[in-house]
Amino acid sequence: MNLESTATSAEYWSDLADALNTPMMKQFLAIKKDFPDTILFFRMGDFYEMFLEDAKIASSILDIALTKRQNAVPMCGIPYHSKDNYISRLLNAGKKIAICEQSKPEEAGSKLMTRDVVRIITPGTVIEENLLSGFQNNYLAVLHLKKSLIYFAIADFSTGEVFYSSVSVTGLERLIAELEKFKPSEICVPKSEHTFFQELEYFKNREFTVLKNQIETSEKDSFQVLSKYLNEYIRETYRDNKLVLREPKILSSGKFLEMDRETIRNLELVENEKEKNNTLYSIFNFCNTAKGKRLLKQRILFPECDPVVLYSRWEKQDILLKTVLAPYITALKDFGDLERILTRFRGNHAYPRDFRSLLNSISSGIKLKEELEKVSYPFLIPIEELKKISDFIQERLHPGDDLPVILGNGIFLKKGFSQKLDQAREAGVKGKDWILDLETKEKKRTGLNTLKIRYNKIVGYFIEISRAQAEQAPKDYLKKQTLVGSERFTMPKLEEIERTILEADEIIQEIERTEFNRMVEEVLKFSSSLLSFSEEIGDLDFQISLLTAKDKFGWIRPKLSEDRSLDLSDSRHPVVEATLPPGQEFIPNSVYLDTQDKAIAVLTGPNMAGKSTFMRQIALNQILFQIGAFVPAKSAKLPIVDKLFTRIGAGDNLTAGESTFFVEMKETANILNHYTEDSLILFDEVGRGTSTYDGMSIAWSILEYLSSLSVRPKTIFATHYHELTELSRLGGIFNLYLETLEKEDRVLFLRKVKVGKAKKSFGIYVAKIAGVPEPIVKRAAELLTDLESKKKEIKIQEAQPTLFTEPETKNFNSQTEESILKLKLEEMTPIEALKTLEDFQKKLRKQK
């Protein structure tokens, strides 16, 4: 036993016990007990201090010094005025922060201040402007299990938006797809349901916020239960219930184009694996308002299935096409984020400059209304209510853009609004002039050149003299404070001026705070009108963004297909084209799909030829069409698609113990179990994750199945199994390929889609240009030649029948013939057929 370390340990715990027994640490521990899952920001003067385990966690994340209080208690601290930066970093690390403020001494003569938690900030409940990105929503999800259904709410507390929906416990893919679209920063579940959700595969690596207060679930409407959970969490985190969420929108099945999580990721709609640039959202986001940017992202993730909505958007665009957009764009740049301003007003987080932003927005909105009325654009804003708000604010607000960030740090109310306020300001200004004058006179009277009159919040106004000259201070100076290098004094005249200044400041603070609160309350009376105004602004910004993309990229207006066919002429990939280097042009391609004879395209061609790009551009054109946008094509006639599936690429899911092939089959199964006749399906290399014959058999069987349907979903099936092109003899299947040009020892990928089938895969050439060593490439070419010649020999020698022709029987004995005649080919899978054929071969070889 190490006696020295034992003694040290005992000494440490003794010191820690003593340190925790102080009045302040007792107060900290009492508050911390009520907020165990948060990092407690404990206000002490101009700092927020963190203690014990909170300090260890925070210091590690924030990279700040960890010290010890009274040699035992771990602690770290941050300046109160720069807390937002630190809070942001803790939120990004998934932490919750409890803000504990100090107010007044607990009792007369006590040095211990009263402290209370005034706000709990969690990743999903942020409304503070400095902690949010203007163009991104910040969602929180609440999940609730009731019988065989999972009800879920998605809410953005910063904008007040709420979305409700439900899924069957057997239909979790839709829940996962919705969560992938919204990307909630925080997911909340009731305590009694935590285990159920934690055991679901998708949530295994997710941290939940457990809602401790169980809501009575007797209500028939489970959405009411979700509403109660949301409001309870608001009360818990905001410490009051002022924050109000808006009327929820129901995410009903069939209203929007359904896309699963793989499709959202594969198409890189709003983000990709590396960044948030080079996505569909990033290349045609020309919005100028925060609301417009958020709305554009929502509409990309939720394309419409209602043609009436699309026609309405097109009608608005047709009006704007006849006008000059520049004045509208200029006006939109003056708009503030009205949704979040209103939320801050409700949550006691408003800033003086929010009123200026509100005024500018209303002023620009009124001008826009006047201009848009001239061209009969339906810009439906509540003009009279907006004018009332504007007049009310203008009567009070200080003119100019130099309003203080925080109330009390500058002029908020205009001169002339309140006589009492003007007098107090004048007294304050005069008092400060008197201070300067007094300093000059005292320097002259005393002859002390180090004399200065200063101010701080703790001591107030004081005369400061260096220690070297302090003994020469006049007798009428009263000592106030001793420092290492100076002495601080006061005098009757200074105290008189100080009272004048402080009384004036107190009057100013009281009047401005009272009027500020009154202005907030008045604005909130018009919340509904302001939110309606915000929606109209967002929609106008969205429409102008689409028109800007049309002009910039040369996109065209698609037409609605009446016969459910998909017809794209010279279509292009919007993102690839927009990000090509100068001088390069995207090679366009055409495609036609219907639900009968041209429903399923088997697409062949070498790697790098452009198969995946071709499929993605079809999907992206379809999405652009269903949000009401223009599309990159020469002409386009597109149907309303209810579900869009992509199976493009796959990787191991190691955490779930799933191989690449298993992931691929899960995605394929999801498509085949959920498609409808109005779906668009894009398969890329199905079956490549297993052996050649297994993979080919699965791909073959899928195509056979899709062909057998009376109404076939529109499908592109990209493959390297050239044998699958033989299936074009089946109904609904046809062949497409990516054209190539062989030139000496080079292969040119022409990127052009043609009707027919590819002759080669050019895999060895791709290996060569990728840098595979020359001896390996050369040997691979030899082996390929050998294998292909043997393949031909086998075909010639064996004359093997296809799966769809009856085999020749002249060399078979009667028993073999009888066995073949008994086969029910229509009930056999390709794998079963190949296995049976292999058995017959073995029998024949034995006979020979």
Swiss-Prot record:
One Gene Ontology biological process: mismatch repair
PROSITE patterns linked to this entry: DNA_MISMATCH_REPAIR_2
A GO MF label: damaged DNA binding
Domain of life: Bacteria
Keywords: ATP-binding, DNA damage, DNA repair, DNA-binding, Nucleotide-binding
Binding residue positions for ATP: G605, P606, N607, M608, A609, G610, K611, S612
One Pfam family here: MutS_V
RNA-binding recorded as keyword: no
Stretch forming the signal peptide: none
Gene Ontology CC, one term: cytosol
Protein task: This protein is involved in the repair of mismatches in DNA. It is possible that it carries out the mismatch recognition step. This protein has a weak ATPase activity.
UniProt record similarity statement: Belongs to the DNA mismatch repair MutS family.
Protein name: DNA mismatch repair protein MutS
Lineage summary: Bacteria, Pseudomonadati, Spirochaetota, Spirochaetia, Leptospirales
